[in-house]
């Protein structure tokens, strides 16, 4: 069986196989899932596909028994050419939160290839609650901020809101045309029932990053010790760093040694224009 697995980023293994520099910090769970699948004795033949503008044309590379495909844009034409070249038995769309999900779905359906859609985040709800708790005065950017953002892309809230709204519409189209959908949570299932009532739903829990399965072994903290709070991302308001900061004084009042660690996009790496932000 041959599976074409569309993911939202070019994972490090794909960049390495195709002679590109790995540019993504995230996506460790994708690499972990790929390693787990390829290690299985009955693993299908997998081609991991992504949209990457650094690939001027359709590019297919192989390394360690895995194929990787890069398309320069997520157009129906590019994905149609990819499907013709790979001839997969199944297309697995990992996530509905990016525009390429819809176009590869269209290309696969036109070619008569079954499609499995995996929910990674329900964009319609993310868009609805993206800026919850953010003061209204911060939700609109001025012309100067938009000018700077064009040259030094940052995280303007109104720009992000427009992007999330667009992706929510694209996701709705994907799910409206889906016949098979996997999800992890009751929230996912509820969303699929509303957005894809015609689809068969499958519960599919996922792997964690490899670090969770290798030494040193992690153990829950001893009750009463000062906690270490981890926020997986703080670079956009959906993750609610602003809410955590409001609650932090109450936490510190009870646990003076508590520590908050924030992962994700570091503004200091974005150059001097964004450092004062």
List each model region and its residues.
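Glycosyltransferase donor-sugar binding loop
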Residues: 259-277
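N-terminal subdomain of nucleotide-sugar transferases
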Residues: 1-69, 113, 251
